[in-house]
Each structure stands twice: as structure tokens, then as C-alpha cells.
Amino acid sequence: MESYVKFQTPETLEKAVLDMVENSYKTGKVRKGTNEVVKSIERGESKLVVIAEDVSPAEVVYYLPTLCEERKVPYVYVKKKSDLGLKVGIASAASVSIVDYGKNDDAYKSIVSQINDAKSGKSENKE
């Protein structure tokens, strides 16, 4: 596990997050790439940040979890940047920011709740 990964994401949550990323991408409400993600967080546009665990060098995304915590933006990890990239129409993506999740309000609330559970360690017993 990379040093910037602060908690493990359960597989069911990862799948739900990737589905939401894909649906949000179809509406054009996703920022891809670390620079765009940082801008969306700093502008207060970001609703959810997704960070790949296999980014090399780690410094590319190392500060994103801290920035998200400072700005109170939920964030989550996915195992592979290639999986994340596939959902947003590119080969790989180190990070993605959802700026509008559309009509997926219930799914968004569920994902944020599961992220909070994963951060507090509650999800470890469910796997």
C-alpha cells in the first residue's frame, strides 16, 4: 500500500465509485488529471475525488488526501489507474474529481457514507 493511501476501499465500494465516475463522465461533469482535480477542489466545485493507488511516482497525488480533508471533500481510492482512466475515456488517470453527480443523489450519499465507514475501519469486518 502506498504511503498516501490512508484507508482500504472495499471492492463493492470501488465498483460503485467507478460506476458513478462513468455516469458523471457521460454528462461531462468530471475533471481528470491531478492538476484539474486540484483546481476543482480549490474552487469548491468538487463533490468527490477518486485517487488511484498505483500512481508512480507517488508524489503526483501524495497531497490530494490532505487537500481534500482541508476542504472537506470526500475522497476514495481505486486500485488501478487504468480502471479509473477507462471510465473517463483515457488510458489511465491518477485522479478524477466529480463536480456534478447528476441525478445520482442516493448513490452519492451511499458512497460518502461507505467512505466514512472505510475511514473509521468499520468496513474491514464486512469483507
Curated annotation (Swiss-Prot):
Q: Which GO terms describe its molecular function?
A: ribonuclease P activity; rRNA binding; structural constituent of ribosome
- InterPro entries, per the entry: eL8/uL1-like, Ribosomal_eL30-like_sf, Ribosomal_eL8-like_CS, Ribosomal_eL8/eL30/eS12/Gad45, Ribosomal_eL8/Nhp2, Ribosomal_eL8_arc
Q: Which PROSITE patterns match?
A: RIBOSOMAL_L7AE
* Gene Ontology cellular component list: cytoplasm; ribonucleoprotein complex; ribosome
Q: Does the keyword rRNA-binding apply?
A: yes
What this protein is called in its record is Large ribosomal subunit protein eL8
User: Which superkingdom is the protein from?
Assistant: Archaea
| Assembly with partners or alone | Part of the 50S ribosomal subunit. Probably part of the RNase P complex.
Q: Which species is the source of this protein?
A: Picrophilus torridus (strain ATCC 700027 / DSM 9790 / JCM 10055 / NBRC 100828 / KAW 2/3)
The keyword Ribosomal protein belongs to this UniProt entry's keyword annotation: yes
A GO biological process of this protein is: ribosome biogenesis
